[in-house]
Every structure is written in structure tokens, then in C-alpha cells.
């Protein structure tokens, strides 16, 4: 049991390593965009500001797509064979899950108190995952789907058809 917990912890640690680097880049960009620190060179209409804005937006990728990051990286540590294939299976299953939730919400969202017509955002119960407007399941949904995908992969990978 302890080995399984350690494998899960190792699989969760892989994407977390990227958080530190991305956070540092965001912090540096924020400093370089501050006119209080940098002076007039950091005014919002200058090329200096716009270049650092581009770099900062790129650095936000890790935090904006954290669900996908965990869905793809969890099978790296937990799949017993063919890790890359397990990652692809996990990603496809997660996208399928979100498309199915989106279809359910577009038809019957009002029954559960979700207005699917509004924009996805904070406090709405909706999120945009891989450009799919869906129910905001957060990290829990990503980890559950990735866990199911890895379990299915490990159980049925060697099964002959």
C-alpha cells in the first residue's frame, strides 16, 4: 500500500515542478511591467511593456491549463506499461468527459441550477477546459478521470482481442 501511495505522490509531483519556474517568470515579468519600479519605460503603451506582457501570458499557461497538465502527467507515473499511450488515453477520456458534460448541461442544465447560456467564469459553475465550456470540476474531476483512465489502461492493456 505504501508503494502505491508513493507512486501516486511521485506522479503528482511531476507537474508541480513546473509551478515554481512558471511562478518565477510571472513574478519577473510583473516587476518589469511595473512603472513604479521601471519608470516610464514600463508604461502600458511601450514595446517594453508589450514584450513582457507576451512572456507573462506564456508563463500563465501552466496555471490556466493545470487540469490538463495533471490529466496528462498522472499516467506518466502510474501506468505500468506504455506510459505515452496511457497519457493519450487519459487526455482523450478527459476531453470526452467534458464534451459529454457540456452536452448534458446544454440540454438539462436548468434542472441542476446551472445556466449554460452565461459565460464560463468564476462563480458560475462553468469553466473552459481545452476550449470546451463545461462544468467546473476543477482538479478533482481531472484526477478522477485520469485515475480511471490509468486503471483501465493497466487492467486491459495486455488483453488480446
Region locations from a protein language model:
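Early transmembrane hairpin of solute transport permeases
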Residues: 2-160
